[in-house]
Amino acid sequence: MRDQSHYGSKTLDEICAALVERATEFGVEIFDFQSNHEGALIDFIQAQTAGADGIIINPGALTHYGLSLMDALIDAKLPVVEVHLSDIHSREEFRQKSVIEPMARKQISGHGWQGYIEALDLLVEELK
């Protein structure tokens, strides 16, 4: 179980359900995927790029050192929004650097699960 003081109490399934509900309001479809393994994330991005219009990603600890993940996101040539449940900029120093942020359209950090909704709203607006 993740530390609720940093990450809130909503489960990943609940967050995904909220995203699907919001996506339905916009008439768009989302595909969700979770892995603790960088290679699996890269494989998913590479496999889904052709059918996608944008990427919302919470890279977790890969935020700080996931250069292969960053390269896959760059190679996808899609707009990317980086999301973090906690405010990584107010946490330990090692958590404050993101290798993903420079290539992302935006980083949303510290808005809890609602950050995912904000990311979807941003992508839908940008892709209109």
Task: For the regions a language model picked out, list residue spans one by one.
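Glycine-rich phosphate/diphosphate-binding loop of Rossmann-like nucleotide-binding domains
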Residues: 1-26
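Short, glycine-/small-residue-rich phosphate/pyrophosphate-handling segment
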Residues: 29-32, 81, 90-128
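Structural motif
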Residues: 33-46
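Short Gly/Thr/Asp-enriched flexible loops that form oxyanion-binding sites at enzyme active sites
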Residues: 47, 66-76
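Short acidic/histidine-rich motifs immediately flanking catalytic phosphotransfer sites
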Residues: 48-55
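Short glycine-rich anion-binding loops that position phosphate/pyrophosphate groups of nucleotides
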Residues: 60-63, 86-88
